[in-house]
């Protein structure tokens, strides 16, 4: 570990394999001081795509694995950290995508940037978070969606909680949640809090052999936005293409950011339920339709973002999204 600290502190970039080894050492055989020193040195130098991919691979190596018999398998997960208190867009979008027939392995945690993260809102809906891997696999295979609460599937992260808290600043671990799905989802929509991270995380995903992904920053949000243009990098195997999309790309109208404002877990749970049942319309539904449409697109269920949005809207209007929420709530509520 000392060698890695010295190399990074001197401005040297780690290879993917070295970064993968470094995170394994952080989890298994490093002091708090060493953990803090390496994370601080990486932040000061600036993390490269190889270092991000290597850390993510190391985290996945140490994770409790979920292996449903589904291909492709989609996740909608952002980095958080965008400092907007919106509704739970990615969580609601995951339910809608699953309702459209796209197998979904949702990975999430408690709040980072808002009053309610994925785990907060699902907890408010009565979904059991501490789920067994085999049960999650069964839910994905049977109902089309399963939820993985990150702390339950990444026990190695316990070793870095203290040093991260003591540093008090963002580190490489703030980027890794979307890249470390325990089910190794091979089709992803990844939101990032900084537009400069869009190409970096896209190249990291490509190096991790993800089949298809969209990495997006939407006018300040780690989601596709309605209040402005979104910068998006599409990963298709080894190819990464960056472009800009607008709400009209999805066939949707623009709306101010305040129109998708959220609240605490209970309020966001009510919005989530209202959106998937079709009772809540307007911009909150539209931003979910856009992001679910993106998930449907990367999951192979549509040949364009607009077509994906159409399928997302149909999943809501047909009752399929509501059925998916009911299945997730009923199944996870009885698991231990």
From Swiss-Prot:
Disulfide bonds: none annotated. Keywords: Amino-acid biosynthesis, Aromatic amino acid biosynthesis, Glycosyltransferase, Magnesium, Metal-binding, Transferase, Tryptophan biosynthesis. Anthranilate 2 binds at residue 164. Binds 2 magnesium ions per monomer. Its cofactor is Mg(2+). 5-phospho-alpha-D-ribose 1-diphosphate binds at residues 78, 81-82, 86, 88-91, 106-114, 118. Anthranilate 1 binds at residues 78, 109. It is an enzyme of class 2 (transferase). One of its GO terms (molecular function) is anthranilate phosphoribosyltransferase activity. GO terms for biological process: L-tryptophan biosynthetic process. Mg(2+) 2 binds at residues 222-223. Mg(2+) 1 binds at residues 90, 223. Pfam families: Glycos_trans_3N, Glycos_transf_3. Pathway: Amino-acid biosynthesis; L-tryptophan biosynthesis; L-tryptophan from chorismate: step 2/5. GO terms for cellular component: cytosol. It catalyses: N-(5-phospho-beta-D-ribosyl)anthranilate + diphosphate = 5-phospho-alpha-D-ribose 1-diphosphate + anthranilate. Belongs to the anthranilate phosphoribosyltransferase family. Homodimer. Catalyzes the transfer of the phosphoribosyl group of 5-phosphorylribose-1-pyrophosphate (PRPP) to anthranilate to yield N-(5'-phosphoribosyl)-anthranilate (PRA). NCBIfam families: trpD. This is Anthranilate phosphoribosyltransferase. It comes from Halobacterium salinarum (strain ATCC 700922 / JCM 11081 / NRC-1) (Halobacterium halobium). The gene is trpD.
